[in-house]
C-alpha cells in the first residue's frame, strides 16, 4: 500500500499555549482511501488538518514532536509552497478561500500561479466544470451566488491542480440538503478516481457509503477507529454517547414535517409581518410574506441556500430596509431603528462579532445580565477558556462565545443564524437546552438553520422558505 499520510507519535503544541493540541497521534492512510476524522469541538481536528496541509508548523507556528508525512513531504522540513500541488483544502467557510470576484477567475487562480498557458487553463476549467457539474456557475459573480454554490466552486478550485490528497474541513456545516448532495457527488467522483480524501466533520449522515474508515479524536488523541461497516452498526445512542451526530436522519425529517407551518391559534402575535417584500433595489429576494412570531417560542427558519433567510433576519432586526410591506410589534407598526434596539443577532460568520481580548470580556460586552456569566460559561463548556483570546479558539468554540453573548444581552428578540454550524452533538444539545431556558425570558427567538437534529428537537414551530 502506498502511504499518503503517515503520523508517528505526533504531538503538536501552539506557541504560547500550555498544553499540546495533538498528543501521540499514530495514523497511516493509503492511496485512494477516504477516511473521516470526527470528535467534539476542540478535540484537535482543525489542528491535525493544518498539519496535513502544511499550514502548521510553517504558517501557524508551534512545537512538533514525532514524525509526520503528507505524501513525501515531512512536516517541519518541507516549505509551505511544496504542499500546494500535493494537497487541496476546502474549509468550513467558503468566504475565507475566494481570491477573485467571479467564478471563472476563481477556478483559473491556482493554475495562473503555476504560470500555465491561458489555453491550458481554459481547457482545465471546462474539463473540471463538466466533471463536477458546475457549468451553470461559470461566469457568475462570486458575491451573487449562494453559500452552497460558493462551496462547490471552492471544491473545484481545490482540485484544479489535481492534488494527491484532498482535505475537507467541515465543508457541509452551512449547507442545505441539496448542496450537501452535490458535495457528496463530487467526493464520490474523486474517490472513484483513486484520490486520497480526509474528511473532518460533525454532520455524519451524508458520509454513509463514502468513507472507508472512521477515526475518533478526543482531547488531541486518537481513541477509537472503525472500518465503515462496523461504524455503521453503531446505534444512535452509542453515537451520542461518543459525542457524535446521528447517521440516520429519517426520524428528524418526519418531526420537521410535523412542525412545519403549524397553524397558530393566537390572534395577536408579538412580531408579525404583512405583505413583506425583502431584498435589494431592483432585486427582490422574497415577496408578499405574511409571518408571525410569538414571545417565549422558538421558531425554526429553514430553506435552501439562497432563499433569503439571512436577508429576512437582517430586515427583522432593522439592519436592512424592506422593499415593501409592514412589520408590527404587538400589533403596532415598528420602525427600523426600534427593531434594531430590540434585537440581537448571532451571525453565521461569528468572526464579525468578536471584539474583546478575552472570552469573559467578550461575553460581558453589552451584557444586561452579567450576574449569570459563570452559569452561561458552565452551560456552554467555556469556563476553562474564560481568559483565552476569542480568536485563538476553534470555530465551534467561537460559536459558543457569540451564543453566550446573545444569551446575556437581555434583548426582546434574538435571531441565531446557523448557530450550530460548527458544533458537535453534545454542544448542539447544550445549546438546545439554553434555547429552552431562554423561552422563559419571553423573548422572540428565531433560529435560522440547516441542522435537522436541532430543528426537529428544539424548535416549537418551523417556517420553511422556498426559492
PLM regions: where:
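ABC ATPase NBD Q-loop/coupling interface
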Residues: 67-82, 326-339
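Catalytic Walker B motif of ABC-type/P-loop ATPase nucleotide-binding domains
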Residues: 166-169, 414-417
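Helix-to-loop junction immediately C-terminal to a conserved catalytic motif
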Residues: 53, 317
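Conserved ABC ATPase "signature" region
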Residues: 119-137, 370-385
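The feature captures the beta-strand-to-loop junction immediately N-terminal to the Walker
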Residues: 38-40, 302-304
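H-loop/switch region of ABC-family ATPase nucleotide-binding domains
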Residues: 201-202, 449-450
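Conserved ABC ATPase signature
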Residues: 141-145, 149, 389-393, 397
Amino acid at each position: 500500500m502506498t502511504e499518503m499520510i503517515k503520523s508517528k507519535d505526533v504531538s503538536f503544541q501552539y506557541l504560547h499555549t500550555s498544553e499540546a493540541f495533538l498528543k501521540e497521534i499514530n495514523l497511516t492512510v493509503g492511496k485512494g482511501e477516504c477516511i473521516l476524522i470526527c470528535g467534539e469541538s476542540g478535540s484537535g481536528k482543525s489542528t491535525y488538518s493544518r498539519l496535513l496541509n502544511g499550514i502548521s508548523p510553517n504558517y501557524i507556528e508551534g512545537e512538533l514532536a514525532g514524525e509526520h508525512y503528507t505524501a513525501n513531504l515531512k512536516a517541519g522540513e518541507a516549505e509551505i509552497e511544496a504542499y500546494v500541488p500535493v494537497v487541496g483544502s476546502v474549509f468550513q467557510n467558503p468566504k475565507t478561500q475566494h481570491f477573485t470576484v467571479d467564478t471563472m477567475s476563481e477556478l483559473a487562480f491556482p493554475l495562473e500561479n503555476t504560470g500555465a498557458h491561458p489555453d491550458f487553463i481554459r481547457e482545465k476549467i471546462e474539463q473540471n466544470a463538466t466533471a463536477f457539474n458546475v457549468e451553470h456557475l461559470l461566469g457568475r459573480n462570486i458575491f451573487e451566488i449562494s453559500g452552497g454554490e460558493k462551496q462547490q466552486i471552492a471544491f473545484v478550485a481545490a482540485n484544479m491542480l489535481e492534488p494527491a490528497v484532498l482535505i475537507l474541513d467541515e465543508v457541509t456545516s452551512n449547507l442545505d440538503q441539496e448542496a450537501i448532495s452535490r458535495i457528496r457527488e463530487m467526493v464520490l467522483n474523486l474517490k472513484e478516481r483513486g484520490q486520497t480524501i480526509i474528511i473532518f466533520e460533525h454532520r455524519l449522515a451524508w458520509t454513509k457509503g463514502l468513507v472507508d474508515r472512521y477515526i475518533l479524536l478526543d482531547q488531541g488523541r486518537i481513541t477509537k477507529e472503525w472500518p465503515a461497516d462496523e461504524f455503521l452498526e453503531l446505534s444512535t445512542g452509542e453515537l451520542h454517547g461518543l459525542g457524535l451526530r446521528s447517521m440516520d436522519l429519517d426520524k428528524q425529517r418526519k418531526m420537521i414535517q410535523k412542525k412545519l407551518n403549524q397553524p397558530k391559534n393566537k390572534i395577536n402575535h408579538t412580531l408579525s409581518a404583512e405583505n413583506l417584500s425583502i431584498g435589494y433595489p431592483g432585486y427582490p429576494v422574497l415577496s408578499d410574506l405574511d409571518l408571525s412570531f410569538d414571545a417565549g417560542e422558538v421558531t425554526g427558519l429553514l430553506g435552501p441556500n439562497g432563499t433569503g433567510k439571512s436577508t429576512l433576519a437582517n430586515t427583522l432586526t432593522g439592519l436592512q430596509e424592506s422593499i415593501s410591506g409592514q412589520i408590527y410589534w404587538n400589533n403596532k407598526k415598528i420602525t427600523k431603528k426600534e427593531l434594531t434596539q430590540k434585537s440581537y443577532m448571532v451571525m453565521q460568520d461569528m468572526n464579525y462579532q468578536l471584539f474583546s481580548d478575552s472570552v469573559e470580556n467578550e461575553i460581558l460586552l453589552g451584557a444586561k445580565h452579567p450576574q449569570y456569566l459563570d452559569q452561561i460559561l458552565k452551560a456552554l463548556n467555556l469556563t476553562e477558556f474564560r481568559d483565552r483570546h476569542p480568536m485563538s479558539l476553534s470555530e465551534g468554540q467561537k460559536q459558543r462565545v457569540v451564543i453566550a453573548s446573545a444569551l446575556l444581552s437581555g434583548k426582546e428578540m434574538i435571531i441565531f443564524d446557523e448557530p450550530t454550524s460548527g458544533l458537535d452533538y453534545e454542544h448542539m444539545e447544550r445549546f438546545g437546552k439554553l434555547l429552552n431556558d431562554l423561552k422563559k425570558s419571553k423573548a422572540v427567538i428565531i433560529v435560522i438553520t440547516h441542522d435537522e437534529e436541532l430543528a426537529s428537537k428544539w424548535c416549537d414551530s418551523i417556517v420553511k422558505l422556498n426559492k
